[in-house]
A protein has these predicted regions:
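Conserved glycine-rich cofactor-binding loop
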Residues: 8, 15-17
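C-terminal substrate-recognition "lid" of short-chain dehydrogenase/reductases
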Residues: 135, 213-242, 247
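The beta1-alpha1 cofactor-binding region of Rossmann-like NAD(H)/NADP(H)-dependent oxidoreductases
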Residues: 40-41, 62-74, 105, 219
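Alpha-helical segment proximal to the catalytic Tyr-Lys
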Residues: 128, 172-176, 233
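Active-site helix of classical SDR
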Residues: 123, 159, 167
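Substrate-binding pocket helix/loop in short-chain dehydrogenase/reductase
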Residues: 99-100, 104-112, 194, 205
Length: 248
């Protein structure tokens, strides 16, 4: 079944990890996908890899989502080059971990600017086409730490909690146009981001996951694809934890 035939999607942070898997899942079911990431090499490589399996599905765009003007320009470019967007996935995210006592102002600003302001920038830039689109969807990738917090991640937890509040406000504001807006809150997923953890930290984390292991990027992509589908039309303003039971 091609759930996304004739659909156009934008996936930020699509160059690696969870975002690349989301782009692949949407492309596999017929979507044309704009793969957006910070560096040209990363989004270019991701698009090339997905195009090898699903020819012509992906176009790469190197843009910093924290840059408001650049995201406005990106929206225009995607509109001209691919078409009007139906699905926006805000997945770009960074960490700058450290205990609050040692956290620098720039660590706070970088994380909030990317993870939270980045979503504000893209929703502002793409909301007009979304409001006119068929089956319009916004899906924000939050985190379980935006729900339960995490020592050493005050900046990241605040950005993800903010993203959850933003999700609910956007869901209410755009509901009249049938645009749904939901958040997915991953637990610990195997990507470059979690590769930074030491083995001792990984073991401690796994001890707190009822299902007993880190998740895979496919676990998140499957949830995003469902929320992006026609079948999810009556779901909005919700947060779905995909976390092996961590937050139950
Ligand atoms: N992995 C986990 O366990 C986990 C858990 C909970 C939530 N999440 C969230 O899931 C999302 C994806 O995580 P991941 O683990 O796949 O991360 P990742 O492997 O570190 O990849 C992050 C992606 O975001 C892009 N990105 C970062 N800053 C950007 C910016 N300013 N503008 C545009 N793109 C930017 C990166 O671009 P480049 O490739 O060009 O550098 C990269 O493609 C993030 O929002 C993260 O917070 C992850």
């Amino acid at each position: 079944m091609q759930r996304f035939a004739n659909k156009i999607a934008v996936v930020t942070g699509g160059g690696r990890g969870i975002g690349q898997e989301i782009a692949r899942a949407l492309a596999a079911e017929g979507a044309k996908v704009a793969v957006v990431s910070r560096s040209e090499s990363s989004c270019g490589k991701a698009a090339e890899e997905i195009n090898a399996d699903f020819p012509g599905s992906c176009t790469a765009y190197a843009v910093d989502v924290a840059d408001h003007a650049a995201v406005q320009e990106l929206s225009k470019k995607i509109g001209d080059e691919i078409g009007a967007v139906n699905i926006l996935v805000n997945n770009a995210g960074v960490t700058r971990d450290g205990l609050l006592m040692r956290m620098k102002e720039e660590d706070w600003d970088t994380v909030l600017d990317t993870n939270l302001k980045g979503a504000f920038n893209t929703v502002k830039a793409f909301m007009r086409p979304l409001m006119k689109a068929e089956d319009p969807r916004i899906i924000n990738i939050a985190s379980v730490v935006g729900i339960i917090g995490n020592a050493g991640q005050a900046n990241y937890s605040a950005s993800k909690a903010g993203l959850i509040g933003f999700t609910k406000a956007v869901a209410r504001e755009l509901s009249g146009r049938q645009v749904t807006c939901n958040a997915v809150a991953p637990g610990f997923i195997k990507t470059d981001m979690t590769d930074e953890l030491t083995d001792a930290q990984k073991n401690a984390v796994v001890g707190n996951i009822p299902l007993g292991s880190f998740g895979e990027t496919k676990d998140i992509a499957a949830m995003v694809a469902f929320l992006a589908s026609k079948e999810a039309r009556y779901i909005t303003g919700q947060v779905f934890a995909v976390d092996g039971g961590m937050t139950m």
